Amino acid sequence: MSANALLKRGSLAFGAIGVAAVLYRRMLRGAILNWGATDGEAHARLPGDELLEQADGIATRAITIDAPASAVWPWIAQIGPSPRGGAYTYDWIENLLGLNMHSTDRVLPAYQHPQIGDVLGYGKNRMRFERVEPRRVLASRSEDGNWVWSFVLDERNGQTRLISRNRFRLPSLSAKIGMVPMEPASLVMERKMLHGIKQRAERLAATRPYAALPPPSTQGSERSSWQSPGASSSSLPT
């Protein structure tokens, strides 16, 4: 094959990649990053955002759970690698990455009172709890400060809106390139996680009186005045 033919093929390949990238950003990226979230939730300033003000990317995913926050919080509180409760997603994928996740269907009393400063994970995957409001907010930040992951619970009329917000900074070109396949991959994992929490919380609420759930600890936590988008409404998105 001649040099001109190779150059032409290379130009066509780069052109196709460029077109695919534009189509992805314009047509698919918003749906992937904001699965399940309303426009108000996707654009709202949520608790935990203050931990990484200048973010290169934001993902906001959400689900409505037919259970009160008291039945949802236990699964959020104990999230994390073994011996904690896992991430309620595809464990086999997590463990291929060496994350030591084993999702449990049980509430683990030893991990029901997360504290600011608690550390999850190992090495470069370490996350530290930075904001804890029992039954309302759990926000953690990576050790390098480039990733913040927040769970926000909004309860109304016995239902809970669970919002998962990821804010991330991409300080290098390799990080930016690596994020392209990570965005759809993270949707696969996080969608499974949100449904996993929903199933566990609804089962817990159906089999156990709400009042019997462990009371929240206020030690090492703070309370915000945040109100969710549409807080004036008595109903949550379906």
Label each region the model flagged.
Residues T160-R169, M182-T238:
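Long, non-transmembrane cytosolic or organellar matrix-exposed soluble domains/tails
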Residues W35, A42, R141-Q199:
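Beta-strand/loop substructures that line and gate deep hydrophobic ligand-binding cavities in soluble
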Residues M1-A13:
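Membrane-penetrating hydrophobic segments
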Residues L12, G18-I116, A206-A231, L236-T238:
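Hydrophobic ligand-binding cavity/cleft-lining segments
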Residues S70, P81-S82, P134-V137, N146:
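Short, charged/polar surface micro-motifs in flexible loops or helix N-caps
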Residues H113, G117, R131-S140:
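Short, hydrophobic/aromatic-rich segments at coil-to-beta transitions
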Residues D66-S70, R131-R135, V152-R161, A201-A205:
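A short, structured loop/turn motif at beta-sheet edges
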Residues I58-A59, K124-N125, N146-S150:
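Short, surface-exposed coil-to-beta transition loops
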